């Protein structure tokens, strides 16, 4: 889907019951606002919906918390895991007053980086992605002593080498 009319037709035909508007907070956590299909109209899809930005850690103070979630209709996909037919759409976060992209929106930051790379001539394509780092331990022990805050000992889990 790519247009508001296409999305609205899915709601009208009963193919979709809910719209799940998703965005990422500054720490990379996926946030969302789910709307009942009866609340979805052309204005919401083209202009967005207001939400309280003070609810997102690191964004806005309560006295200046109005923000807008503006759907990017090129990102719509049916959620395969919900019991009710739900359409997912990723959103841009805008300042409610200026309607400009919010400077702490990770999606907007990624877009600015992409534009900078193209404009500066560094390259014409940029690849970005999260880097999930973690450790797998076979055993972890910790101890707290009277004169020491904490000591930790561990052994790494040895994984077999996978050859192709």
Identify the function of each model-found stretch.
Residues 132-143:
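Short, conserved secondary-structure transition motifs
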Residues 1-18:
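Short, Gly/Pro- and small/polar-rich lid/capping loops
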Residues 25:
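Short, acidic, Ser/Thr-enriched surface-loop or helix-capping motifs
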Residues 149-154:
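Surface-exposed loop and adjacent secondary-structure segments within mature catalytic domains
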Residues 155-161:
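Conserved small/polar residues in nucleotide/adenosyl-binding loops
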Residues 41-120:
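Glycine-rich, N-terminal phosphate-binding loop and its surrounding beta-alpha-beta segment
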Residues 18, 120-129:
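Flexible, glycine/charged-enriched surface loops at secondary-structure junctions
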């Amino acid at each position: 889907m790519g247009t508001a009319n296409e999305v609205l037709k899915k709601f009208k035909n009963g193919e979709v019951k809910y719209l799940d508007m998703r965005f990422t907070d500054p720490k990379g956590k996926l946030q969302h606002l789910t709307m009942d299909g009866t609340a979805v109209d052309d204005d919401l899809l083209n202009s967005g919906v207001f939400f309280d930005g003070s609810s997102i850690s690191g964004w806005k103070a309560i006295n200046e918390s109005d923000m807008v979630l503006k759907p990017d209709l090129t990102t719509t996909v049916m959620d395969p895991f919900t019991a009710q037919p739900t359409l997912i759409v990723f959103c841009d976060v805008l300042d409610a007053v200026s309607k400009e992209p919010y400077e702490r929106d990770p999606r907007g930051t990624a877009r600015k980086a992409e534009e900078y790379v193209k404009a500066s001539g560094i390259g014409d394509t940029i690849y970005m992605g999260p880097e999930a780092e973690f450790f797998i331990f076979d055993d972890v022990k910790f101890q707290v002593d009277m004169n020491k805050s904490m000591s930790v000992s561990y052994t790494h889990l040895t994984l077999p080498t996978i050859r192709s």
